[in-house]
Each structure stands twice: as structure tokens, then as C-alpha cells.
Amino acid sequence: MNNSFIQINQISKHFGDVKAVDNVSFEIQEGEFFSLLGPSGCGKTTLLRLLAGFEYPTSGNLLLDGIDITALPPDKRPTNMVFQNYAIFPHINVQRNIQFGLRKLGLTNEEIRKRVNDVLSLVKLEGYEERFNSQLSGGQRQRVALARALVRQPKVLLLDEPLGALDKKLRDEMQLELRTLQKNIGITFVFVTHDQQEAISMSDRVAVMSEGKIQQLSTPNELYKNPHNIFVSDFIGETNFLKAETKSQDGEYINASIEKLGEFKIKNNLNISENSSDVVCSVRPETMMIDKEKSDWDICLEGKIKQTSYLGEMTKFYIETKEIEKIITVSSQYFDNQSFKNNDCFISINLDDISLLNKK
């Protein structure tokens, strides 16, 4: 059974010679919390605006619930959008901000009152009806913007970096609230962000974008554990890259030569071709072990600690070995400045924790 609710079919959007979105195709399921993630200028907001109807594609088409919406104006689409700057009218109170636009739907006063009360309860703003924008905190303004978008009962809510203006603690709180809200009301959310942690903590699936293209579309766990290329591995979390070349295939493994470390059998999850130098090995910091003594792990390197950063729940180490100029690893075990004599240490890696990636 195909539950595809939104279908993006070979969509491109050009601004002059700039390909903001370049031949993108994917599907979003009904009731899904779906994120578009990428750096500034990657095309994620343009793609969201194409879904909203604020931009029209150069080529390709968009289907929503089986209906072609490619040429429909924004007010004819079953979507609504929440902006980063909230776009709250300062001269009218919360209740009238949320009511704005409902009159055009031909609703009675009683229907409008019920919808507004319901959505105020949904976003936890009961009692704030008479307040103005200047009397609200950042989080409350965000809730007003959400309420105004949801009161029209869209099939899809589009969110353009809605938490970007909030401080970290409030942003973390709003992430949890947004996720809970989406699950409670059950509609499809399409969420744009440049914040990796935000995307992987909230989403059912994430599309990672770069230069107008989808680099990988997967669950958060799959993106982190099995990135498809060097861009995704580097953009999602933190990693160590080691230069490598592939040799011969050996079942599900491939013989790979890691620069200055030797030749090893690495699991070839991406079916990377033999005899290729266009590859790297990626090792996540938390999969490595730092210790005062040599281990029996597959790879064990003697190194020197160059810098440490205490992060509360963990300590981050920047280490130099004779084979590798800089390695980053983390440990949940507390180490002070006296833990390692002369800053000497051993770094251990298991081969199962090494991902072989294409550079592109």
C-alpha cells in the first residue's frame, strides 16, 4: 500500500542561472514529521515555498493527496505556513491575530469562537486572548504563530526555521512541544532547519540537502549510523575522516587501505567499487576509546592529547598521533588534567565502527 501524501516529482527552481532546487523527487507520508535539513543556500526554504505556493517551479510537478497543486495559488492549497519571524500583527491582540482570515472561510461567529478556543487550548495559551505582541515572550509568540496557522485546519503545516530566534533552552522545550503537538493532531508537518540536532530529534525522516539536491533521505538513526557520502557524514554530527583506497571485494566486505594505518576488511554497505581512491573512512568520536593503556581492539594508536573540552556529560579530546594529525574522541568518563601522564594516551578503533564513504 502506497501512503504517499505529498509527491515531489522532478522539481526544479531556477533564479536566473542559479539552480536553487535541482531536479528533486521524493515523497512524504500522511501524518509524518518530515524535515528538510541543510546549510544556508542549499534550497530547503525554496522547496518549502514551492510547496506553499509562494514560488512556482521551473519544471516538475507537486501532488498533494493525489491532486496536482503545482499551479495553485497559496490560498487554494490545503497548507499553511509558520515563519521564523512569526509575522504577528502588533496592533491587534492574540485572539484577533488567530481569527484573522477565518472570516473568508464563511464561518459563523460561533464556529470561529470554537475554533479559536480549541487552538488556544492546543498550544497552551488559554488566558492570553487579550494580550498584544509586546506582552508576549518569544515562546508565546511562537505559539500564537502556530495557533494562527493551525486554526484554518490545514492538511499540511509548513514550518520555516520557526525556532531559530529562540534561545537554546526555550528552543529545546519548543522542539518537544512541537513534536507532541504534531502527534496529537496527526497532520503532516514539513519542517525546515539548518540545525542537525533539531532535525534528528524531532523528525520521522529527514532529507539532507546541498546545492539544490537531496543528498540522502532517511530516518535520523540511518542518517547518523549509515551516511551515504562525506557531506552527510560531516553535516550530521561530528566525525573523523581518514584517507583511504579500496582494493578487492571480499563478500560483503572490501579490502581498503587506510593511509598510514594499513589494509583492513571494511564492511561495504554502499557497494563502493573496487580500486577506487575517491573514498574516505569515517569514524564517529563516541565509537572510539581513549585510555592510558594499549588495548586489543582492531586498531590501537599511541597519541598525545593536545586539547580537552569538558562538556558536562562528556569530555572531548583532540589528539595527535604519528599516523593522524588530529583525532576527535569523546568519553563519558571524567578525566582531569592529571589523568594522562605527559598527555600520552592510546586511541582504539574497532573495524565495525568504520564507515566507508564516497567523497561525493
Residue ranges, per PLM feature:
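Helix-to-loop junction immediately C-terminal to a conserved catalytic motif
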Residues: A52
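ABC ATPase nucleotide-binding domains
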Residues: F33, L72-D234
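ABC ATPase nucleotide-binding domain helices that frame the ATP-binding cleft
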Residues: T45-L48, V144
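The feature captures the beta-strand-to-loop junction immediately N-terminal to the Walker
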Residues: L37-P39
